[in-house]
């Protein structure tokens, strides 16, 4: 016979007014469907409202916010960080959450999140986000509890470990090794692992905010933008962190790009989406190419791992980078610490480099017959389907 211990948390839904926000196709949020009945016209209309945290303040404070002032919510969202989390990675979690905190501040709310490792905050209770260290061997995992009636996010849990970052270090070594000496000195560089994990937590936190992955985020900026330190300091390498982590493989030695700009972060679309959901704005995304786009295998501009709005030239640049790195792999690995300086690593990275080369070629192939489907939005987009221009398809074949 087997014996099990089951734990159950039962929460009474709070009796609070929720400021509902109608869903808009330009922004990707999880939604609830509400059927509204009009007793005057005797008609029923179904509307979609986004799921979000309920930020409230006194009427007097809300008036200040409408005048453009930044205010604090009546009750902050507690971000509990498991005390067993190693100190270097506590910093990663805080930095990632603070990136989103700045987006909320731009929407008119300051000090939305407060950090805690106190025992009394360790329960999955109302307006709490628990960061637990462990049970994240296959990537950062999150679960969210929401009110099915109002769409209010009640609490959330995120399981995180540095194992998630370790899995990307090999890719970072190949894509950014020419620019980041830290990874050439140590394949397990703590500083690099921190940078990778910060980006991963920032991406995962979008799920806690019930934001859908915007697969168009990485294909908004031009290759020149992504190689410009000035541009990167302002926007980073993607218009949205929501679709996961891709590194800046377009930057080259001589571009003057700092290592911090080799990683994605919360950016323009994310700020616009938070402003739409929590601020006083109904504006569309500030960058037209950043409108919400779900994953589409036939759309070359909605794929994981693609970078820039010029996929052909970006892929060619990626191929050229692999050609530069491949002959240097043996020398790089010979200069690594003794436990990493092995023939197995030489062999493994040679195979990975060849696989990366093939990945860039596959990106070019995606242009052939590629098409993009975008929602019809009056005054913005009135064409449902657009196809990759003929010259780009021919260029990919040549």
Residue ranges, per PLM feature:
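Surface-exposed helix-capping loop/turn segments at secondary-structure junctions
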Residues: 104-113, 207-217, 366-371
């Amino acid at each position: 016979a087997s014996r099990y211990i089951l734990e159950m948390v039962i929460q009474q839904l709070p009796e609070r007014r929720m400021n509902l926000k109608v869903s808009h196709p330009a922004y990707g949020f999880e939604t609830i469907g509400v059927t509204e009945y009009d007793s005057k016209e005797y008609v029923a209309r179904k509307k979609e409202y986004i799921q979000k945290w309920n930020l409230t303040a006194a009427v007097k404070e809300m008036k200040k916010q409408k005048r453009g002032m930044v205010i604090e919510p009546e009750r902050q969202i507690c971000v509990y960080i498991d005390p067993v989390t190693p100190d270097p990675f506590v910093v990663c979690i805080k930095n990632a959450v603070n990136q989103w905190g700045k987006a909320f501040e731009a929407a008119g709310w300051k000090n939305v999140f407060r950090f805690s490792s106190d025992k009394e905050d360790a329960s999955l209770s109302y307006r709490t986000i628990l960061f637990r260290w462990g049970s994240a061997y296959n990537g950062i995992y999150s679960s969210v509890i929401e009110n099915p009636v109002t769409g209010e996010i009640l609490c959330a849990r995120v399981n995180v470990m540095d194992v998630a970052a370790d899995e990307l270090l090999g890719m970072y070594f190949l894509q950014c090794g020419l620019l980041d000496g830290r990874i050439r000195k140590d394949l397990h560089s703590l500083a690099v692992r921190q940078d990778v994990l910060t980006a991963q937590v920032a991406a995962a936190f979008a799920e806690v905010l019930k934001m859908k992955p915007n697969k168009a985020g990485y294909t908004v900026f031009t290759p020149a933008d992504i190689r410009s330190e000035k541009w990167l300091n302002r926007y980073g390498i993607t218009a949205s962190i929501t679709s996961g982590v891709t590194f800046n493989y377009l930057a080259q030695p001589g571009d003057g790009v700092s290592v911090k700009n080799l990683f994605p972060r919360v950016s323009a679309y994310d700020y616009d989406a938070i402003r739409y959901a929590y601020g006083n704005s109904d504006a569309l995304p500030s960058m037209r190419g950043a409108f919400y786009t779900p994953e589409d295998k036939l759309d070359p501009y909605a794929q994981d791992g693609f970078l820039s709005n010029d996929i052909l030239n970006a892929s060619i640049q990626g191929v050229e980078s692999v050609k530069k790195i491949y002959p240097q792999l043996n020398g790089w690995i010979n200069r690594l610490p003794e436990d990493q300086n092995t023939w197995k690593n030489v062999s493994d990275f040679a195979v990975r480099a060849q696989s990366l080369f093939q990945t860039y070629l596959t990106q070019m192939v995606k242009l052939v017959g590629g098409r993009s489907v975008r929602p019809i939005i009056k005054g913005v987009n009135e064409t449902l389907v657009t196809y990759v221009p003929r010259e780009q398809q021919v260029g990919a074949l040549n």
